[in-house]
UniProtKB/Swiss-Prot annotation:
Major localisation: cytoplasm
Free-text remark on how the cofactor is bound: Binds 1 Mn(2+) ion per subunit.
Keywords from the named record: ATP-binding, Cytoplasm, Decarboxylase, Gluconeogenesis, Lyase, Manganese, Metal-binding, Nucleotide-binding
InterPro entries: PEP_carboxykinase_ATP, PEP_carboxykinase_C, PEP_carboxykinase_N, PEPCK_ATP_CS
Single GO molecular function: metal ion binding
GO annotation terms (biological process): gluconeogenesis
Record-level GO cellular component terms: cytosol
Designated name of the protein: Phosphoenolpyruvate carboxykinase (ATP)
Cofactor(s), by name: Mn(2+)
Pathway: Carbohydrate biosynthesis; gluconeogenesis
Length: 524
């Protein structure tokens, strides 16, 4: 108990420190925290919040970190006094109880990883942490010194939020100087995962390393590919490939040695999960995996089509559940980078090759359509721009990440492509979703290098290089104008989307890099 005195909790009944999966499973059942499915996967409800609460996330505004953080709607400031008040409240919630402490690493690179300690009163949240982060060896646990501590007091709410000037009784606060985060009022597991991701996105660029919201895999010839895209654009599905080893499905770093996973697990969407289309993910859902907000049938099997609790049903599992994973969770420098956009307007080509400068432009634009349920209040696709394909998690100015990406693309001669996994033949509601077969053919041509031998033509207004023919993809699909019956509607929609890109990019023109990169976008 003595080594936990620094946590500042009073009268702790018992501390369950770094429990095994079997022990966590026994605690979950004893605490009545959920149900077991027919194949012994534990299944929990996250309560009112089935997605993140981005409007309730804050950073403590104090020096020296305040001069690095890009303050605004994403990175909202909070005072040190208010943080202290809510941390005290959270510690009171966790005091006098039995608690779970889980020690993990974030980052598979020894030179770049951070040691994180999570404190919670819910066994399944400790289980989630064990699944999602890198599980230290016994020796590493014996010498574990936390760089950062997360207090998850999900049962604690802030009734005074109005007089405190906050958005709701939920709070997710990061104190960069004290290396502490506190969570209150939401049980959603993703707050812990994405919270530490936000911190990695603060720490690493200041060490001249790139942090990325992407998935990564590596081929038989050790060729590494990165897939960028927001939730629901196909990152997890497209990077899970039987011919390639999965490095990770969501969060990575890129340092002088190469690419490395931040995590030791995957957090996959399960809505309409089909064993035929996604056998690897389906097969990963077994004992030690943790299902969230799914509906069980009477025989305890999971009804993946049931979205009655949320569209954002999820499963977390240790990456070892994916047979074809890269055991070291790291690899060399990338050969190919793929930006995935689910274009709700049906304008972007299925695949385009980008120059280094265009790569920085489209990386900063982070265009896609928000897909149902990954955030509160979104129920159908809606066009959105999210800097670096992960704006909610980027504490620094987006051009910091873009500059690092550009430097690395140049240094390691990386090919960059933009792939549309969204609509074709018309906008959402008229056109149809790009088939996964066509998208896979585009991805395969990128990964096997055959796309580099194609003849390219210019895609007007956006000035993108698009292939005239590509094996496995109907040629008519390659240039979107050919898929629209109403050519006038196509031209009007194309110009409207180009205008949206131009308008969005103006927000980066507060710094000289932003003005420089703006030259490489669409022109009307």
């Amino acid at each position: 108990m003595k080594k936990f005195d620094k946590l500042g909790l009073d009268n702790i009944k018992e501390i369950f420190h770094n429990l095994s999966y079997d022990e966590l499973n026994a605690h979950e059942k004893a605490n009545n925290e959920g149900l077991s499915t027919d194949n012994d996967t534990f299944c929990v409800d996250t309560g009112i919040f089935t997605g993140r609460s981005p409007k309730d996330k804050y950073f403590v505004k104090q020096d020296p970190s305040s001069k690095y953080i890009a303050w605004g709607k994403v990175n909202q400031p909070i005072t040190k006094e208010l943080f202290d008040k809510l941390l005290t409240k959270a510690k009171q919630e966790l005091s006098g109880k039995k608690i779970y402490v889980q020690d993990v690493f974030c980052g598979a690179s020894l030179q770049s990883r951070k040691a994180v300690r999570f404190v919670t009163e819910i066994a399944w949240q400790a289980h989630f942490v064990k699944n999602m982060f890198i599980r230290p060896s016994q020796e590493e646990l014996e010498n574990f010194k936390a760089d950062f501590i997360v207090y998850n007091a999900c049962k604690c709410i802030n009734e005074d939020y109005k007089q405190d000037g906050l958005n709701s009784e939920v709070f997710v606060i990061f104190n960069v100087e004290e290396n502490i985060a506190v969570i209150g009022g939401t049980w959603y597991g993703g707050e812990m995962k994405k919270g530490i991701f936000s911190m990695m996105n603060y720490w690493l660029p200041l060490e001249n390393k790139l942090s990325m919201h992407c998935s990564a895999n590596v081929g038989e010839k050790d060729d590494v590919a990165l897939f960028f895209g927001l939730s629901g654009t196909g990152k997890t599905t497209l990077s899970t490939d039987p011919k390639r080893r999965l490095i990770g499905d969501d969060e990575h770093g890129w340092d002088d040695e190469g690419v490395f996973n931040f995590e030791g697990g995957c957090y996959a969407k399960t809505i309409n999960l089909d064993p035929e289309h996604e056998p690897e993910i389906y097969g990963a859902i077994k004992r030690n995996a943790l299902l969230e907000n799914v509906v069980l049938r009477a025989d305890k099997s999971v009804d993946y089509a049931d979205a009655s609790k949320t569209e954002n049903t999820r499963v977390s599992y240790p990456i070892e559940h994916i047979e074809n994973h890269e055991p070291s969770l790291k690899a060399g420098h990338p050969k190919n980078i793929i930006f995935l956009s689910a274009d709700a307007f049906g304008i972007l080509p299925p695949v385009s090759k980008l120059s280094k400068e265009q790569a920085m432009y489209y990386f900063l634009s982070g265009y896609t359509a928000k897909v149902a349920g990954t955030e509160r209040g979104i129920t159908e696709p809606q066009a959105t721009f999210s800097a670096c394909f992960g704006e909610p998690f980027m504490p620094l100015h987006p051009t910091v990440y873009a500059r690092l990406l550009g430097e690395k693309i140049e240094k390691h001669e990386v090919n960059v492509y933009l792939v549309n996994t969204g609509w074709s033949g018309g906008s959402y509601g008229v056109g149809k979703r790009m088939s996964i077969k066509a998208t896979r053919a585009c991805i395969n041509a990128i990964l096997d290098g055959s796309i580099t031998k194609c003849e390219f033509e210019n895609f007007e207004v956006f000035d993108l290089a698009i292939p005239k023919a590509l094996e496995g993809v109907e040629s008519v699909l390659l240039n979107p104008i050919n898929t629209w019956l109403d050519k006038n509607a196509y031209i009007a929609t194309r110009d409207k989307l180009a205008h949206m890109f131009i308008q969005n990019f103006k927000r980066y023109e507060d710094v000289k890099e932003g003005i420089e990169f703006s030259k490489f976008g669409p022109k009307i």
